[in-house]
């Protein structure tokens, strides 16, 4: 967009640049949607140790623990975490509909995930929401503004958490989701299963998540095959 504005300024002065219709038609000036950031397995393992922030502020600890919970719940998006209701949790079974796609998701909650839920769940009778991220007051617009504010705070605290732990990958509310999908891919889970687990609207969405890691995995496969051939000859 800045290039378009600069060119328009030059076109106004015909001595600087001629007008060429649809000059930018075939030029992509946005951001690549398929570039996703995921943590390495060892980095996610470090984050799964929920005690590593016990000396930090209460807000940072909560952010850390909720991030871990999102990973434990199959890469749960923050928007779904915020909007999940108490009635969606029945014993250790969580059933909810994704805000983005409307697809129903059913998850068996692990012991570690349940411990985090019990620590941070809203225990009041006034709110229908499982976590005290949104209030039950006001209309949909008010609640959505609350969600946006909560998301900004969450991402800011995640940045601080990443710096504290010395992570090489920037932490955002999407990192848990991308990490879950990527680790599943490296464990050779079929993309169709990953799609169902994450509630994607189509397999193409899942492939978008995994595309940046295809080359690396193919390179690793190539090295494994070469190594296997060498060992077979030496043996």
Name each model feature, range by range.
Residues 87-95, 168-169, 189-208, 234-235:
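Short, polar N-cap/turn motifs at the start of nucleic acid-interacting alpha helices
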Residues 19-26, 83-119:
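Conserved tyrosine-mediated DNA breakage-rejoining catalytic core shared by Y-recombinases
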Residues 22-62:
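Long, amphipathic, Lys/Arg-enriched alpha-helical "connector/arm" segment
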């Amino acid at each position: 967009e800045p290039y378009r504005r600069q060119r328009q300024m030059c076109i106004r002065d015909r001595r600087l640049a001629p007008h060429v219709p649809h000059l930018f038609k075939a030029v992509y000036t946005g951001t690549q949607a398929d570039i996703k950031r995921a943590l390495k397995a060892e980095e996610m393992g470090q984050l799964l140790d929920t005690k590593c922030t016990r000396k930090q502020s209460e807000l940072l600890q909560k952010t850390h623990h909720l991030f871990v919970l999102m990973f434990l719940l199959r890469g749960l998006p923050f928007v779904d975490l915020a909007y999940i209701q108490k009635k969606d949790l029945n014993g250790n079974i969580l059933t909810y509909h994704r805000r983005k796609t409307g697809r129903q998701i059913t998850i068996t909650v692990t012991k570690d995930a349940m411990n985090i839920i019990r620590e941070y769940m809203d225990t009041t009778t006034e709110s229908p929401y499982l976590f005290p991220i949104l209030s039950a007051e006001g209309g949909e617009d008010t609640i959505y503004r609350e969600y946006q504010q909560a998301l900004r705070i969450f991402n800011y605290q995640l940045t601080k958490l990443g710096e504290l732990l010395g992570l090489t990958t920037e932490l955002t509310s999407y990192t848990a989701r991308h990490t879950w999908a990527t680790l599943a891919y490296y464990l050779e889970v079929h993309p169709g299963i990953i799609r169902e687990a994450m509630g994607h609207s189509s397999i193409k969405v899942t492939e978008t998540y995994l595309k940046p890691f295809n080359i690396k995995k193919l390179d690793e496969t190539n090295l494994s095959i070469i190594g296997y051939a060498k060992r077979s000859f030496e043996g």
